Curated annotation (Swiss-Prot):
Gene: truA
Originating species: Burkholderia mallei (strain ATCC 23344)
Name used for this protein in its record: tRNA pseudouridine synthase A
Subunit structure: Homodimer.
Function: Formation of pseudouridine at positions 38, 39 and 40 in the anticodon stem and loop of transfer RNAs.
Taxonomic lineage: Bacteria, Pseudomonadati, Pseudomonadota, Betaproteobacteria, Burkholderiales
A Pfam family: PseudoU_synth_1
Length: 270
């Protein structure tokens, strides 16, 4: 039997998703808790491996098991052994054709950026921060050069293991909201550090360091050295993983973050 789980976690509490020898990752915490509840080892496969500091709101995993448990039993039982920084949101039996990673056809990330002369300790680990105003119109113009199917080699990390750098970026939405600017990135898939590298470039344009057309030059170069430094992870959230309707994957619970209404309004906007 294949079981899918919807997971939320505070990325600031972990050294990324993927299991490590030190055991301080989201995958390690989840698999330890599943083992406690199921009294057997269960290996999880994830939709997207997030980095240290990156949060999960709509993360999806699957595992195979011979155990027959009620759906909510998996939720309640696993959560009983998880730390407060991780929670299973839902559980659902799936056909063998479902795969958390390979069945997904799109991913959506949001970035919450605090723009203020002084950093806020209340936002530590929850939002990125810049101390100077940003030109939103310039960032929107720059983002328009990136939408579409492109070779995103200039925005991938040296550790990226993806077979192809070609991805289809469907949307970059940018919306100011008081002292915040919110970004929405939606694509069929992302390269390692791709969103944070895109953020670094957009912020550089917003600060006036480069014209909006610079992003087209960076994209065309396919050279990571031509782009801006990788931006901080703290404000980045994996919010949604899209699957074919036949799997009826439950939607992510975005209401758990204070900016959910702003993010909802970003849908379809640029």
């Amino acid at each position: 039997m294949r079981i899918a789980l919807g997971i939320q976690y505070d990325g600031a509490a972990f050294c990324g998703w993927q299991s490590q020898p030190h055991g301080k990752t989201v995958q390690d915490a989840l698999e330890r808790s599943l083992a406690e509840f199921a009294q057997t080892s269960l290996h999880t496969t994830v939709a997207g491996r997030t980095d240290t500091g990156v949060h999960g709101l709509g993360q999806v995993v699957h595992f195979d098991t011979d155990l027959d448990r009620a759906d909510f039993s998996w939720v309640r039982g696993t959560n009983a052994f998880l730390p407060p920084t991780v929670a299973v949101q839902w559980a659902k039996p799936m056909p063998d054709t479902f795969h958390a990673r390979f069945a997904a056809f799109e991913r959506t990330y949001y970035y919450a950026l605090y723009v203020h002369p002084v950093r806020s300790p209340m936002l530590a680990g929850r939002a990125g921060w810049v101390h100077t105003p940003l030109d939103v119109d310039a960032m929107r113009e720059a983002a328009a050069h990136l939408v579409g199917e492109h070779d995103f080699s200039a925005f991938r990390s040296s550790e990226c293991q993806a077979k192809s750098p070609v991805k289809h970026l469907y949307q970059i939405g940018i919306r100011p909201d008081g002292d915040f600017i919110h970004f929405r990135f939606r694509a069929n898939a992302f390269l390692h550090h791709m969103v944070r590298n895109l953020m670094g470039c957009l912020v550089a344009v917003g600060r006036g360091r480069y014209p909006s057309s610079w992003l087209a030059e960076v994209l065309e170069s396919r050279d990571r050295d031509c782009a801006a430094p990788t931006f901080m992870p703290e404000g980045l959230y994996l919010a949604h993983v899209g699957y074919p309707a036949e799997f009826a994957v439950p939607p992510a619970q975005l209401g758990s973050v204070p900016w959910s209404s702003v993010w909802a309004d970003l849908d379809g906007r640029t």
